[in-house]
UniProtKB/Swiss-Prot annotation:
The lineage of its organism: Bacteria, Pseudomonadati, Pseudomonadota, Alphaproteobacteria, Hyphomicrobiales. This is Succinate--CoA ligase [ADP-forming] subunit beta. Belongs to the succinate/malate CoA ligase beta subunit family. Its EC number is 6.2.1.5. It comes from Chelativorans sp. (strain BNC1). Substrate binds at residues 274, 331-333. GO terms for biological process: succinyl-CoA metabolic process; tricarboxylic acid cycle. GO terms for molecular function: ATP binding; magnesium ion binding; succinate-CoA ligase (ADP-forming) activity; succinate-CoA ligase (GDP-forming) activity. InterPro entries: ATP-grasp (IPR011761), ATP-grasp_succ-CoA_synth-type (IPR013650), ATP_grasp_subdomain_1 (IPR013815), Succ-CoA_synthase_bsu_CS (IPR017866), SUCC_ACL_C (IPR005811), Succ_CoA_ligase-like_bsu (IPR005809), Succinyl-CoA_synth-like (IPR016102). It catalyses: succinate + ATP + CoA = succinyl-CoA + ADP + phosphate; GTP + succinate + CoA = succinyl-CoA + GDP + phosphate. Succinyl-CoA synthetase functions in the citric acid cycle (TCA), coupling the hydrolysis of succinyl-CoA to the synthesis of either ATP or GTP and thus represents the only step of substrate-level phosphorylation in the TCA. The beta subunit provides nucleotide specificity of the enzyme and binds the substrate succinate, while the binding sites for coenzyme A and phosphate are found in the alpha subunit.
Amino acid sequence: MNIHEYQAKELLRGYGAPVAQGVAIFTSGEAEAAAKKLPGPLYVVKSQIHAGGRGKGKFKELSPDAKGGVRLAKSIEEVVANAKEMLGNTLVTKQTGPEGKQVNRLYIEDGADIARELYLSILIDRTVGRPAFVVSTEGGMDIEAVAEETPEKILTLAIAPERGVTNDDVTKLNAALKLDGAAAKDGETLFPILYKAFTEKDMSLLEVNPLIVMQNGRLRVLDAKVSFDNNALFRHEDVVELRDTSEEDEKEIEASKYDLAYVALDGDIGCMVNGAGLAMATMDIIKLYGAEPANFLDVGGGASKEKVTAAFKIITADPNVKGILVNIFGGIMRCDVIAEGVIAAVKEVGLKVPLVVRLEGTNVDLGKKIISQSGLNVIPADDLDDAAKKIVAAVKS
């Protein structure tokens, strides 16, 4: 689960991180009062969407030379003018795709005198099975580009969970970020604070980009991105309350109600599979034969008829889907249950696109019999390769 920047900063402020004063607003009429609560004379007006690249983004409704989704204002009047121009419009960034995201919230923040911009994040390093800091002196940039072009400028430092952030870890992080004086002293406090927030709140990512050194030599969290482990949300009611479903795909929200692992993609072949590995293999083979998957959908090992029906409805709700591939290997999951669910869903929502079904495993003969006797126009497949070829051919024809 993702949250907005202003929510992430409020959370980190609660742990003692150095965060600038700021006020979130939902209407342009709130802009003046919000700005008056801040010291000034510089203000930053920030679009709040769940996507990066806001500063370089463009609003669909504005002229191409209009400013992006993060704007500097030198007066309260400028804050108000920017708020009126940004709220309600659609911001397109490198992460939103061409459809963009509507800006329904702004964060008015006190400006900062920046001396240096740094990069810092904490994530789970799966190669060692530990939380790890990733830091670089190249802040405010796309860290993936830095990793590709100048990997020597990035330090990845795994943290032993039983010890937490040690003095030695702090020394290494300060050295990698070239911090000294007051900034290094701030680092001694900040690094353990961020690690504590990451672990206590079950985050999957905590990214500060940039972490800045101000002209007075002190550190400040200038931007913050936080993602949480969905599997741990039951422990954090306070975090769940921060969820903004307007930023999420409606189909993914519906899938979560049925405990379905669903991720919307940009292709035109819908997939319903059991098991994450088989689901990824199914998407790969669709791409191998020249098409693109419209989604990742894992119905799991113990899906009921109702769950399968819900999954099928979610797939068919995507207007981009031109064909559907059901690929089931029945271990715990029974093929007859899948067959009954698919038939129930087709009868309820109708079938306007080609449907290829490949079943194998537990009760496979019964599953195939149920489908063959259903009277539905379903294309059977013998194996995964055969299924992929048939659905791609059906969609292209």
